[in-house]
Curated annotation (Swiss-Prot):
Its biological purpose: Catalyzes the ATP-dependent amination of UTP to CTP with either L-glutamine or ammonia as the source of nitrogen. Regulates intracellular CTP levels through interactions with the four ribonucleotide triphosphates.
Organism: Chlorobium luteolum (strain DSM 273 / BCRC 81028 / 2530)
Annotated L-glutamine binding sites: Y59, G363, L391, G392, M393, Q394, E414, R471
Enzyme Commission no: 6.3.4.2
Name under which the protein is recorded: CTP synthase
One Pfam family cited in the UniProt record for this chain: GATase
Protein origin, superkingdom: Bacteria
Length: 597
């Protein structure tokens, strides 16, 4: 593996139990190093055999995070982007399935010259080459790699062996391991117990890896005595034992780690001296607004199919946190099962009493669809602020067709192929697609926004780029009927063929989008649609008839000039990808096709 010069590597591993927060730790460290002036890249290595999480159940994996270049990745990449305000790419997420697939493909092509293909060296070399590939994509000072799973998992062993070999090849001044462990608090004994951490480090040592820094997650702060004990039994300097007790919000984790001097220990061990003091004033102010907002509270209901597992909507939940801070209000979230709305005994006025905004979340399949449609109908008829995302927009179109346009059999062909009024239909390019993984319309595409609409008011610009993950689209045959009954098509693809944003003219805030705005919301750059939605919910809660639609200046980028006239008359099935003359920002280069048209 040819390693680019001067790049330093940090590997983050976890022990004792899962869900300790390796992703938040990695993102927080990356944010701190970036705030000191270093160029940081961050990635996730997942040990499962799936090529990517695109076809995995939300109940097992949580949300699928889509990057600009169309990669379907782990939700931790969302944390990376939100904390660092940097876009990730296909190269930022590597699964063991992708590694094995690449090795097997090379063997079939004869690239191993008839040799016996083994985990060592072939699989390990493939992992090391992928890391070098990311390093070559940018001029980075530090690359942080989170290794998924828990020490002791069989699936993680090749990743750990690759890390061991790399440290031997590069030297201790170029690569270090941060091991996140759990120090449980035993309430009956009023004690923090270090034995699980000791055993976790012992298991890591069995792979040939001595951790350089230990981050100890705990319910209570670690005393100096506890840190000394952990350092003594784990062969780590007590200054390299970092305490990370529970925080009120994940956005306080970087501030806690800064106080514990984690970033300074990393800089010292890697021999990095060119840095400056971090300015976290805006971040600190954001945390203050999250914890102690001065503008009151709003109540938002999220109607979805996977509400039993909130990680399925992780980016939506975080985007609402960002929007709460930007509006200086606390956003109380109520997760509601879509199926509940299908019951004839469900009392919407009672169950949604006190709700100031309704968001219908994305998803796939027909389960709960009629319930989503009923929640949308209630939001429309009661003039409650509404935001629909992806499938939420498609359901909003079906509801409007049935109950406003007088098309009672209206539906999506995803749910009823024989509908007389298929207002949502399979995209022309998708009709011959047989495989499921990586074949949807994925990644960042441009959208032209119509002036004088709510969408234009919150974005403050005519041209935007948003991330997509869908196969079905609005059927343009029905656009005249929708417009006649008060629907505004406020955002479309540059050629005018794909409907991206819809809104109702006479509703205080009824906006639905085909794309996923939640994927681009950041701590210091809240997404305009979420800012506008929460602002509308606040106005509704305050009894204001019409909310102020303009977004704050720092919420969105500088408004761009009006684009050239939109081209019309594209033939069905013609390429509706991203024309070069409409590209607003370059996509990060990926390492494989992800179904982009």
């Amino acid at each position: 593996m040819a390693r680019p010069k001067n790049v330093k590597y940090v590997f983050v591993t976890g022990g004792v139990i899962s869900s300790l927060g390796k992703g938040i730790l990695s993102a927080s460290l990356g944010m701190l190093l970036k705030s000191r002036g270093l160029r940081v890249a961050i990635q996730k290595y997942d040990p499962y055999i799936n090529v990517d999480p695109g076809t995995m159940s939300p109940y097992q994996h949580g949300e699928v995070y889509v990057t600009d270049d169309g990669a379907e990745t782990d939700l931790d990449l969302g944390h990376y982007e939100r904390f660092l305000d940097e876009s990730t790419s296909q190269a930022s997420n590597l699964t063991m399935g992708r590694v094995y697939k690449s090795v097997i493909d090379k063997e079939r092509k004869g690239e191993y010259l008839g040799g016996t293909v083994q985990v060592v060296p072939h699989v390990i070399d493939e992992i090391k080459d992928r890391l070098a590939e990311l390093a070559k994509k940018g001029n980075y000072d530090v690359i942080i790699t989170e290794i998924g799973g828990t020490i002791g998992d069989i699936e993680s062993l090749p990743f750990l062996e690759a890390m061991r070999q790399m440290k031997l090849d590069m030297g201790e001044r170029n690569l270090l391991n941060i091991h996140l462990t759990f120090v449980p608090y035993i309430k009956a004994a009023s004690e923090l117990k270090t034995k699980p951490t000791q055993h976790s480090v012992k298991m890591l040592l069995e792979t040939g890896i001595q951790p350089d820094i230990l981050v100890c997650r705990s319910e209570k702060p670690l005393s100096r005595e506890i840190k000394n004990k952990v350092g003594h039994f784990c062969n780590v300097n007590d200054l390299d034992v970092i305490g990370l007790n529970d925080c009120d919000t994940i956005y306080e984790v970087p501030l806690t780690l800064l106080q514990e001097k984690l970033d300074m220990r990393v800089l010292k061990k890697l021999g990095l001296k060119q840095y400056h003091e971090p300015d976290l004033a805006k971040w600190t102010d954001f945390c203050r607004k999250v914890k102690h907002p001065e503008g009151g509270e709003v109540n938002v209901a999220i109607c979805g199919k996977y509400t039993e597992y909130p990680d399925a909507y992780k980016s939506i939940l975080e985007a609402l946190v960002h929007a709460g801070a930007s509006n200086n209000v606390k956003v109380n979230i109520r997760l509601i099962r879509a199926e509940d709305g299908e019951s004839k005994s469900y009392d919407f006025s009672k169950e949604l009493a006190g709700i100031n905004g309704i968001l219908v979340a994305p998803g796939f399949g027909d389960r709960g669809i009629e319930g989503k449609i009923e929640f949308i109908r209630y939001a429309r008829e009661q003039n409650i602020p509404f935001l629909g995302i992806c499938l939420g927009m498609q359901c909003a179109s079906v509801e409007f067709a049935r109950n406003v346009c007088g098309l009672p059999d209206a539906n999506s062909t995803e749910f009823n192929k024989r509908s007389r009024f298929p207002v949502i239909d399979l995209m022309e390019q998708q009709k011959k697609v047989k495989e499921k993984g990586g074949t949807m319309r994925l990644g960042s595409y441009p959208c032209i926004i119509r002036e004088g609409t709510k969408a234009h008011a919150v974005y403050g610009k005519f041209l935007i780029n948003e991330r997509h993950r869908h196969r079905f689209e609005f059927n343009n045959t029905f656009r005249p009927a929708f417009e006649e009954h008060g629907m505004i098509f406020s955002g479309t693809s540059p050629n005018g063929e794909l409907v991206e944003i819809i809104e109702i003219r006479d509703h205080r805030w009824f906006v639905a989008v085909q794309f996923h705005p939640e994927l681009k919301s950041r701590v210091e750059k809240v997404h305009p649609l979420f800012h506008g939605f929460v602002g509308a919910a606040k106005a509704y809660a305050d009894g204001v008839h019409q909310p102020e639609l303009g977004a704050r200046a720092e919420v969105h980028e500088t408004p761009s000039p009006a684009p050239a006239p939109v081209q019309q008359g594209f033939a069905a099935g013609e390429n509706i990808g991203t024309p070069s003359f409409f590209i607003e920002e370059e996509r990060p280069a990926g390492d494989g096709g992800q179904g982009l048209s």
